[in-house]
From Swiss-Prot:
It comes from the Bacteria. The gene is cdiI. This is Immunity protein CdiI. The keyword Membrane applies. Immunity protein component of a toxin-immunity protein module, which functions as a cellular contact-dependent growth inhibition (CDI) system. CDI modules allow bacteria to communicate with and inhibit the growth of closely related neighboring bacteria in a contact-dependent fashion. Protects cells against the CDI activity of CdiA, its cognate toxin protein, but not against non-cognate CdiA from E.coli strains 563, EC93 or D.dadantii strain 3937.
Amino acid sequence: MKNLLYVVLLMAVCILGLLIVGTIFYLFLEVFMYFYVNAPISLESFQFTRLLKMSIYGGGILGLGIGLLRIFKIKGF
């Protein structure tokens, strides 16, 4: 039971981390495009929903993989 809680907590941390990194990257990319290409800043909702889906799936898989490797005591984790 303790191992399952560990995996779920690790998945949540990975999801949140990827969401924060992805949001910062997306905002910096919009600012870069505004200053260097003179493209208008367009913060569209479908971009954020796509970013949320990517962070949930990617962070979930990453957290699950790291958690399982740690539970099975694979070297390096």
